[in-house]
């Protein structure tokens, strides 16, 4: 994307699509970018009364066959129509500018001591501010540009010049309307009880009072504008106060006021639309009206139609009036429609699904810069697949394949056609991948364990007649993951899931190499994490405490510290998922007196001029401990199962106390789980926040790194040993010595 500044406009080019797009695809991608930008920022979409999904579906049929600018223009017109945006302009036309020299005189005297001030954007700025002569009894300001302002002058400089003149024409402070922008932050967290960060809404910027200049006089004032530049906010305030009258001359396009943004569908096909609003102090939005409208006439100076119209307005006393204003905007929460009635959506709706997934991640996925693959190319590939999919399952698989490219272990894709309501049972096993082979790390189903059919250290070589390496590779290709270890972990878990009532035949190899086959019955899944071993959740042995954070509950934290208070060291086992104990734990460990332990980043989509592509940063705070601090040595066990809340807990402990991490890198996927719902009730989950260490180091796709690397071995599994825990104990013995 290329951004070119145009004063109050931002031009967003789409050239980066072209290299990957095939014939006919560039126009679809250009329309997708327009749909995405409007969806994220246009003020008309705040109230939820416009079906923006359906608007894209209505526009897409214009784009059949080869790329064609007329078709693309027609698609853009159809797409933007529901917005009823008075600022909308589609297509470039050669602008007609006022005919006045770049270095022409600023002041021209008209009859009746009327000062015509040529403040045309595009004129060379004078070294000193213009001082209105005492002779002036009436004033006309001609603010129409004489040149394209994209590259000529700074909008800020133009405002300074205008304000210096207006300050000489007011006798009390003037309050211009303030710019107000809509911003969006993407879908809400999957768990409605979670902290959401900043929710979508409006951001109103400050405005600045215009103060009278020394010796200012309240003179009759008329202002000439046209359709080439937005009407300045200060002029609108003067009109509202009855202190100015406005003449506009315009052609097919109407004059406008308020923030604008421009997105270029092609080099010569811009779409310009509202970037926000101007708001009065009561919250209502400006809807400006000229005191007189004229047909397009770019002439200026004495005898020109616009100047004559301004003189006619000055001949009669202006009335104080209040131009029409729109009611204050009232943004409403908008959740994605599920479209459950279209299990296998028609082609246009399938295209919408791919575009919506792309747009959501393009705007709101905070770790997009860390992806290995081009997200634009992922969209192209998915759009091509949408042409050929034959049923709801193939449709879901196409979206799943696209989402995999996000490289985020939180990412998952689910729908009925993909079997999310069918795989309700699983084999009660913990698996480990060692040197490319899959081994039983533990049997968690008591019935299966009692049967003796499987033992820790057994190699699984086949499942239901399929070679396990083949099955695992196939499943791994469907897994989005922050790290390769995380990809294999997710694939191995998926490998143990089955529908209810199934019988599963496993081919096994024991330590002696003897092959055997066993048949097992998957059991109903629940949310309980399997026990790693028979150790108590909290124990102390020879001065070293052990705490299983999978089992520790929030209400048990203080009692746990009371139990271990006399230990010289503690091993926290975080090779699983905690129960919301992170802050309570870190507070009692905070010998470093840390005030915060992590920073979370949330994407903020808003118009370019208001801060396009901004990120919000939040510090996770640590508060004073409710009890005595634990000052012993701290070790934490981690591995690829340490994900999300578990990683957050690790960051909290890391900030609070000198901790030694033992094990293998964590999953590298932290940040609350969010979801986008696509046509056909397809859900895609992803990390809604990017979380970093307190010192700013990356966590996403990196994970918490162990100080001491330790991993299970095949021999250790077969001997029933927990080698990671053993390594931690060994470290503490060495440290004691």
Name these PLM-found stretches.
Residues 91-110, 396-446, 450, 534-539:
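PDZ/PDZ-like peptide-tail recognition elements
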């Amino acid at each position: 994307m290329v951004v070119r500044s145009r004063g109050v406009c931002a031009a967003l080019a789409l050239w980066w699509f072209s290299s990957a797009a095939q014939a006919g695809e560039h126009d679809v991608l250009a329309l997708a970018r327009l749909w995405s930008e409007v969806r994220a920022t246009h003020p008309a979409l705040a109230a939820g009364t416009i079906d923006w999904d359906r608007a894209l579906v209505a526009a897409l049929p214009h784009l059949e066959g080869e790329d064609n600018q007329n078709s693309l223009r027609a698609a853009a017109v159809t797409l933007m129509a529901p917005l009823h945006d008075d600022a909308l302009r589609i297509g470039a036309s050669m602008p007609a500018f006022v005919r006045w020299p770049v270095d022409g005189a600023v002041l021209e005297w008209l009859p009746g001591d009327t000062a015509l001030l040529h403040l045309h954007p595009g004129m060379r700025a004078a070294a000193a501010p213009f001082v209105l002569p005492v002779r002036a009894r009436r004033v006309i300001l001609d603010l129409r540009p004489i040149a394209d302002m994209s590259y000529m002058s700074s909008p800020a400089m133009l405002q300074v010049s205008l304000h210096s003149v207006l300050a000489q024409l007011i006798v009390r402070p003037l309050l211009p309307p303030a710019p107000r922008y809509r911003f969006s932050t993407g879908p809400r967290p999957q768990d409605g009880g979670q902290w959401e960060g900043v929710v979508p809404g409006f951001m109103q910027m400050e405005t600045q009072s215009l103060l009278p200049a020394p010796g200012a006089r309240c003179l009759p004032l008329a202002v000439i504008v046209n359709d080439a530049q937005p009407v300045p906010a200060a002029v609108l305030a003067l009109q509202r106060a009855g202190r100015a009258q406005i003449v506009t001359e315009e052609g097919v396009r109407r004059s406008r006021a308020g923030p604008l943004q421009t997105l270029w569908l092609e080099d010569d096909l811009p779409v310009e639309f509202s970037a926000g609003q101007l708001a009065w102090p009561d919250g209502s939005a400006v809807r400006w009206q000229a005191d007189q409208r004229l047909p397009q006439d770019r002439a200026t100076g004495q005898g020109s139609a616009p100047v004559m119209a301004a003189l006619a307005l000055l001949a009669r006393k202006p009335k104080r009036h209040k131009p029409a204003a729109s009611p204050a905007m009232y943004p409403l929460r908008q959740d994605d429609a599920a479209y459950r009635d279209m299990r296998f959506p028609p082609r246009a709706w399938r295209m919408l699904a791919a575009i919506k997934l792309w747009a959501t991640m393009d705007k709101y996925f905070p770790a997009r810069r860390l992806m290995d693959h081009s997200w634009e190319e992922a969209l192209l590939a998915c759009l091509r697949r949408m042409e050929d999919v034959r049923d709801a399952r193939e449709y879901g698989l196409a979206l799943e394949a696209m989402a995999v490219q996000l490289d985020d272990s939180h990412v998952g894709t689910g729908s009925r056609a993909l079997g999310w309501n069918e795989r309700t049972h699983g084999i009660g096993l913990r698996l480990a991948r060692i040197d490319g082979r899959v081994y039983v790390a533990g049997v968690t189903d008591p019935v299966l364990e009692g049967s003796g059919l499987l033992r820790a250290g057994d190699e699984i070589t086949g499942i239901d007649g399929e070679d396990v390496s083949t099955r695992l590779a196939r499943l791994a290709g469907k897994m989005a993951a922050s790290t390769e270890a995380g990809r294999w972990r997710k694939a191995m878990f998926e490998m143990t899931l089955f529908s209810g009532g199934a019988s599963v035949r496993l081919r096994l190899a024991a330590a002696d190499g003897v092959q055997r086959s066993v048949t097992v019955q998957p059991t109903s899944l629940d949310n309980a994490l399997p026990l790693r071993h028979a150790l108590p959740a909290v124990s102390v042995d020879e001065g070293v405490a052990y705490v299983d954070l999978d089992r520790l509950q929030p209400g048990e934290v203080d009692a746990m510290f009371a139990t271990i208070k006399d230990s010289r060291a503690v091993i926290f086992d975080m090779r699983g998922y905690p129960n919301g104990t992170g802050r309570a734990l870190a507070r009692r460990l905070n010998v470093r007196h840390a005030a915060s332990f992590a920073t979370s980043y949330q994407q903020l989509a808003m118009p370019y001029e208001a801060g396009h592509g901004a990120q919000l940063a939040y510090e996770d705070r640590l508060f004073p401990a409710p009890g005595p601090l634990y000052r012993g040595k701290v070790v934490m066990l981690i591995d690829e199962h340490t994900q999300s809340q578990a990683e957050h807990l690790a960051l909290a402990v890391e900030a609070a106390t000198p901790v030694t991490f033992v094990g293998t890198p964590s999953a590298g996927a932290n940040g609350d789980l969010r979801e986008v719902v696509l046509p056909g009730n397809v859900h895609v989950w992803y990390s809604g926040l990017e979380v970093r260490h307190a010192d700013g180091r990356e966590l996403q796709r990196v994970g918490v790194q162990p100080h001491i690397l330790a991993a299970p071995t095949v021999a250790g599994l077969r001997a029933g040993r927990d080698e990671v825990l053993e390594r931690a104990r060994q470290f503490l013995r060495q440290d004691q010595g």
